Amino acid sequence: MERIASFSVDHLLLEPGVYVSRIDRDPATGAAVTTFDLRLTTPNKEPVMNTAECHTIEHLGATFLRNHAEWSGRIVYFGPMGCRTGFYLVVFGEVTSEEILPLVRELFEFVAGFEGDVPGAAPEECGNYLDQNLPMANWLARCYLDRDLADIDEKHLHYQQA
């Protein structure tokens, strides 16, 4: 089998940021779908997110994005990476990291400041509803905003080559 694109990114060089992971096209229509790598931790160097806070960010992120005034109709998916170092955001259209950055900042401001009941955290709405950690989700979102998104540069918007 061929090596998939996400395994071709050198995870020893990868740092937190907002990257275009891939752009796919529907063979029938030519419609584009862009997948973003929202990397919150440095792979293999920093601790990964625990499942509870990762799950909370997923619930808050999906709710925020699917209700966003400008972007809701273009959101395909938001969810965690299996390695728990970040999230994938999939949107309709060919979109750059620079173009999605304001939305990503809004998203993580929402998560950082969220208080109250986590949307979808009830047994009839989620298959693992008890696995939530709002305080840690708030903290991780604030860290990502302050450390990585506030003054983001080119190196953290485009994958680096070895």
Regions found by a protein language model. Give the residues of each.
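His/Glu-rich zincin catalytic helix
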Residues: 1-53, 57-65
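A sequence-composition feature that detects small, non-aromatic residues
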Residues: 5, 28-32, 52, 62, ...
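M16/MPP (pitrilysin/insulinase) zinc-metallopeptidase core fold and M16-derived inactive scaffolds
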Residues: 43, 47-99
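Active-site-adjacent, His/Asp/Glu-enriched structural segments that form or flank metal-binding
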Residues: 78-150
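Histidine-acidic residue clusters that define the catalytic metal-binding segment
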Residues: 146-162
